[in-house]
A protein has these predicted regions:
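Alpha/beta-hydrolase fold catalytic core
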Residues: 1-21, 42-44, 82-83, 107, ...
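Short gly/ser/thr-rich secondary-structure transition/capping motifs
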Residues: 2-7, 29, 165-172
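Conserved HGGG/HGGXW glycine-rich cap/lid loop of the alpha/beta-hydrolase fold
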Residues: 11-56
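Conserved alpha/beta-hydrolase "nucleophile elbow" surrounding the catalytic nucleophile
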Residues: 25-27, 85, 89-94
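Conserved catalytic-core motifs of eukaryotic protein kinase domains, centered on the activation segment
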Residues: 33-35, 57-63, 121-122
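Active-site loop/oxyanion-hole signature of alpha/beta-hydrolase fold enzymes
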Residues: 47-88
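Flexible "cap/lid" loop of the alpha/beta hydrolase fold
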Residues: 95-138
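Conserved alpha/beta-hydrolase catalytic His-Asp/Glu region
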Residues: 120-127, 132-176
Length: 176
């Protein structure tokens, strides 16, 4: 289905006459991460989405905010004639679910290990060294090498666009 100009992959199964359970995966995951869980609820309608940039869904062409993901989800659910779903989100998917629930009616919301505010983390020694080295003339050329050995696995595995989106999401605080 085309949503916000992107091909979005999803599966929709189970009892379509019952409340829809909408499953949203975490960063770097896809439908398969939630499929086993969704299969336990076949008495309900089950919708599992490959979020844009993951699985078989198209990658955004611009940096998407959490609001963009919420708008995409809302448009998808409207096209599927789903009102007041139960949203189950893991990590990144839970963050999207949290913001969705502040804008639209949901029957229930289940968030699993979902960040809702910017994490204040003490920088590791490696990160401090990288930041310092970037300021030293002649060492900037080592930045690419250093990032390969310092960044998170999710960051390393992401495309350039998804890295920008990841930074946007990590810094997005929805606690207010």
């Amino acid at each position: 289905m085309i949503i916000k100009g992107l091909a979005i992959n999803y599966i929709d199964y189970g009892n379509k006459n019952k409340t829809a359970l909408v499953f949203l995966h975490g960063w770097g995951q896809n439908i398969q991460m939630m499929k086993g869980l969704g299969d336990q609820f076949l008495d309900n309608r089950v919708v599992i989405v490959d979020l844009p940039g993951f699985g078989a869904s198209e990658e955004p062409k611009t940096v998407w905010t959490v609001d963009d993901y919420v708008d995409m989800l809302h448009e998808l659910l409207q096209k599927l004639n789903i009102d007041c779903p139960i949203i189950i989100g893991h990590s990144f998917g839970g963050k999207i679910g949290l913001l969705y629930a502040t804008k639209y009616k949901v029957k229930k919301l289940v968030c699993l290990a979902s960040p809702y505010k910017k994490q204040v983390v003490q920088l590791s020694l490696k990160t401090k060294l990288l930041k310092t080295a970037k300021k030293v003339p002649g060492l900037k050329k080592l930045e690419g090498f250093a990032k390969k050995h310092i960044g998170s696995t999710d960051y390393k595995n992401a495309s350039e666009m998804m890295r920008k989106i990841m930074v946007e999401h990590v810094n997005y605080d929805i606690s207010n």
